[in-house]
């Protein structure tokens, strides 16, 4: 895969790996540095740290459990590393099955969650039968009921619904509506495609996006978006599918009260303890990155108006 899992992984390094691992020399150097770090911290055997509480748990196999962790009623923990600390302890609850997974400080995994080959970052909450495979979660991500496969869930990614599937995408500050779905099997070539939903994107109930796709910052997606939209330079938009046609309302989301509610709630919901801030979280919604997209979007819209005039019901943009 494109992301190497190790204890000190954060969202910035993971995103860097995903973006630049086509550079073979860079990939080799990163692998060397990470393997050196792993070698320094590798233990010859599994161990259980101080003040750990393990109750009614069926199987703990080849797992490193750090201090002040509580494991209560788990079904199986195999080949895992649990990075609990006295200030930010980890809780593993009833029915949980975790295999080959790293769980970071302050996280809780509860209520029959099933995870395989995953990384769980600091202060994440995963519960209520959520199923995850080959996925990574960072900094205050909240996952419940649904499933994730090959998903890059950055800080404050949120999915609450049983019928939601996050697959083959990179998300952050994202909220998945009920029955949200993605497909990374375009052209029947197998699961080789992926997409990016930039910071603050939301998908409405029943939304579907066919990858590859690139959705701009703080956009909202409605319906079945089938034609690989790339709206990176049109942030704060509504993307609405009617049949085979997708309509884009540029800047629509910047006028909604929900956007400003989200902007204010995220800093309050950062429950990471001091000393466990691995991922760098920038809460500013207007940054050089997002403002640059706004300026490019303004230029695109001005060119459309110049080409088609002002007396039209809609503009065609490819």
Predicted regions and their residues:
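Glycine-rich hexapeptide-repeat left-handed beta-helix
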Residues: 1-25, 83-86, 91-100, 105-117, ...
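Generic hydrophobic, helix-prone segments enriched in Leu/Val/Ile
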Residues: 29-30, 34-35, 60, 77, ...
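Catalytic alpha/beta active-site cores
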Residues: 68-70, 79
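C-terminal non-catalytic accessory extensions
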Residues: 309-318
């Amino acid at each position: 895969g494109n992301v190497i899992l190790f204890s000190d992984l954060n969202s910035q390094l993971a995103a860097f790996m995903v973006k630049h691992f086509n550079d073979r020399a860079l990939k080799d150097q990163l692998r060397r540095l990470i393997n050196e770090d792993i070698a320094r911290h590798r233990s010859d055997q599994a161990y259980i740290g101080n003040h750990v509480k393990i109750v009614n748990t069926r199987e703990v196999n080849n797992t490193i459990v750090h201090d002040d962790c509580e494991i209560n009623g788990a079904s199986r923990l195999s080949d895992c590393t649990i990075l609990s600390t006295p200030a930010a302890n980890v809780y593993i609850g009833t029915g949980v099955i975790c295999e080959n997974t790293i769980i970071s400080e302050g996280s809780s995994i509860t209520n029959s969650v099933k995870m395989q080959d995953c990384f769980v970052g600091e202060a994440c909450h995963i519960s209520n039968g959520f199923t995850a495979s080959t996925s990574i979660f960072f900094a205050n991500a909240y996952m419940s009921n649904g499933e994730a496969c090959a998903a890059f869930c950055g800080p404050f990614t949120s999915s609450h619904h049983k019928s939601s599937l996050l697959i083959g995408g990179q998300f952050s500050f994202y909220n998945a509506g009920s029955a949200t779905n993605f497909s990374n099997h375009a052209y029947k070539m197998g699961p080789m495609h992926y997409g990016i939903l930039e910071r603050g994107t939301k998908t409405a109930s029943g939304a579907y996006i066919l990858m590859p796709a690139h959705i701009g910052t703080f956009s909202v997606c409605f319906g079945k978006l089938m034609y690989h939209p790339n709206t990176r330079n049109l942030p704060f938009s509504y993307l609405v599918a009617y049949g085979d046609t997708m309509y884009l309302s540029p800047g629509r989301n910047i006028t909604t009260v929900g956007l400003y509610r989200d902007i204010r709630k995220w800093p309050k919901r950062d429950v990471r303890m001091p000393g466990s801030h691995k991922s760098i979280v920038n809460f500013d919604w207007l940054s050089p990155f997002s403002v640059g997209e706004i300026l490019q979007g303004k230029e695109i819209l001005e060119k459309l108006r110049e080409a088609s005039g002002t007396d039209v019901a809609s503009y065609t943009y490819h």
